């Protein structure tokens, strides 16, 4: 199999661009995708995003999290630099932790239409409590829908020991 051809990459504008504009307000239009060259195979793609930041919608105080995004691609895949800039756009976005994770998942579903996706946020404690929202999706009417249900019910059977994120 040969590498990517130039025409396959024409919609990728952020990767390799030294003049990217960092947005400080939520903007899903920054997300870019490319074709999955291995559509006949199920496989996971996982992004570990340890520096996510958003704002509490009530107090305006910053919230910090590590976010884990895993998906089984279908036809499209998310380009990682656009994902980085997209996540950065939450910096001044005021929303609850649970909302942020669901917004991220919904935007990625809209962009890629994956077979399966899960987004797990592990937020640092505020007021002595850490919040770890987990959300997932499997394509309805397929084995991925069943997989999503199973993973949701079993996602935290062995919770980690929280010392001090």
From Swiss-Prot:
EC number: 1.7.1.13
Keyword field contains Cytoplasm: yes
Family statement: Belongs to the GTP cyclohydrolase I family. QueF type 1 subfamily.
Keywords, alphabetical: Cytoplasm, NADP, Oxidoreductase, Queuosine biosynthesis
Amino acids binding substrate: 78-80, 97-98
Pfam families recorded: QueF
Zinc in keyword set: no
Lineage: Bacteria, Bacillati, Bacillota, Bacilli, Bacillales
Organism, as annotated: Macrococcus caseolyticus (strain JCSC5402)
Main location: cytoplasm
A GO biological-process term: tRNA modification
GO cellular component annotations of the record: cytoplasm
Coiled coil residues, start to end: none
Residues the record marks as active site: 56, 63
Reactions catalysed according to its record: 7-aminomethyl-7-carbaguanine + 2 NADP(+) = 7-cyano-7-deazaguanine + 2 NADPH + 3 H(+)
Cellular compartment(s): Cytoplasm
Pathway(s) per entry: tRNA modification; tRNA-queuosine biosynthesis
Protein name as catalogued: NADPH-dependent 7-cyano-7-deazaguanine reductase
């Amino acid at each position: 199999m040969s590498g990517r051809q130039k025409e396959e990459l024409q919609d990728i504008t952020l990767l390799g661009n030294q003049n990217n504009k960092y947005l400080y307000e939520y903007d899903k239009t920054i997300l870019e995708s490319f074709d999955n060259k291995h559509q006949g195979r199920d496989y996971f793609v996982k992004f570990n995003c340890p520096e996510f930041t958003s704002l509490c919608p009530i107090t305006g105080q910053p919230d910090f999290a590590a976010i884990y995004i895993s998906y089984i691609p279908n036809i499209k895949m998310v380009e990682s630099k656009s994902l980085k800039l997209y996540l950065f756009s939450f910096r001044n976005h005021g929303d609850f932790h649970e909302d942020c994770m669901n917004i991220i998942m919904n935007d990625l579903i809209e962009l890629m239409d994956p077979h399966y996706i899960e987004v797990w946020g592990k937020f640092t404690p505020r007021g002595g409590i850490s919040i770890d929202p987990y959300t997932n999706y499997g394509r309805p009417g397929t084995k991925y829908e069943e997989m999503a249900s199973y993973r949701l019910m079993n996602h935290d059977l062995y919770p980690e020991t929280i010392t001090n994120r």
